């Protein structure tokens, strides 16, 4: 009986570790996607004569292409653009930023008043 419990606990640990690793990978890919979308929007809005209407149009096109997708509203796209523009010159982007959830990034971006304060929370 003891060995069975030990084996079961080992299996539970394997499953938990794999699930956690999968969630980390998904988060990493989402953050990279938000970064790329923000970069694209930042670059395009510099060259676009439409201003805010450009991002409104992009949000509608994304909603049409992916009905029901969440996070790609006008507000969400502006957040991605701000995310990119805030961190584009920082060296630690590719490693540290992908380890933090999107909701934590949004909290840091909205609450931190200085770059030093943002860096502090990111490197915790």
At which residue positions do the language-model features occur?
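Basic, low-complexity intrinsically disordered segments
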Residues: 1-124
